[in-house]
Amino acid sequence: MQRVIIVYNPRSSKQALIQDEVIKPMRAIKGYQVGKYEVKQMPVEENAKNLTKILMDGDLILVAGGDGTATVGLNAAMMTKAKVTLGVLGYGNFNDMANMLGEHKCEDLLVDFQRGSIRQLYPLEARINGEFFRYAACYFSIGMFAESTEEFNVKDTRNSLKKGKKRLAYSIKKLMRWYFSSRKRNFLPPDIQLNDTPINNMRIAKNGRKNITRGRRTTDVLFVNSDTVAKMMKGGNYWQRKDEYLVSHGKLKNVFRLGVFMMKSILFHLPGKVMSKETKIDFSTPSEIEIQAEGEYKRVQLTELVVKKSDKAINVITKS
């Protein structure tokens, strides 16, 4: 009998829909042994490790949730020694992973699974200061964009999403308010280097007896593997490629620069460079920054960040 492990977050703003559209129907279908894993209020890595403890060869990991919940399922599928298949149904704000794979209904996903509509996904892998951090199916980011995701963990924001507000429009509105109140801050240090090359045009100037650093600072660096980022910005189908992914960075404190960057990203694709080897970000002095993968963020003390394509691929269900 086919085992299905449903991964979901009981605190999700769409918990009622997940129960009605995924959990109850799955239990009613004959021929499946259905188990559940409830995402706990702990880091992605700990949730993923706990999930691996119940996985067996042949399991279907069925994620019903947003990109954060999907990241737990992805990391468990990458970490386990069992041969598993991952399916994702989007019940979040942006649903980049679910949209990338094309599945939207539980019944359709099961039909595609039975038909063998399965492809290999090559996720990104990040290492912080030489230590493994996390896998990401869609993207990693550091800087301003990463810090903005904290807005969705604010109690008032979560309550508003649960009340059924238009999620995309509401989310964009919240992010823009946050941007205008936060854009003058320094999100990344001035001495940031990408593959040993400085990406800031900074200079030291005199202000009385003090030396001050002037110039436009980089606010964001993104590593993109998916068709979309935050639902609107266009990436590419790098997730199916063994080596390639996109690296994009920008100086986005200026409203005009942000507008140009967003217009290019929405109408065409994210500006950046396609990489086929690992990318190293480093600072001359340790800096506390925010890093996030698919909406799951963490503040870390960073001297070096290395991102590359993982050597391991996993099987994922895609729309036939």
Language-model features, listed with the residues they occupy:
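Catalytic core of tubulin tyrosine ligase-like
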Residues: S160, N225, K312
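ATP/nucleoside-binding phosphotransfer catalytic cores, i.e., glycine-rich phosphate-binding loops
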Residues: I212-G215, K231-S320
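Short hydrophobic segments within beta-strands
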Residues: V7-N9, L89, V224
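Cofactor-binding loop segments of dinucleotide-utilizing enzymes, especially the Rossmann-like FAD-
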Residues: N9-R11, Y91, K319
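Catalytic core of DAGKc-family lipid kinases
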Residues: A16, A82-D220
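ATP/NTP phosphate-donor binding region
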Residues: M1-A64, T71, N75-A76, E107-V111
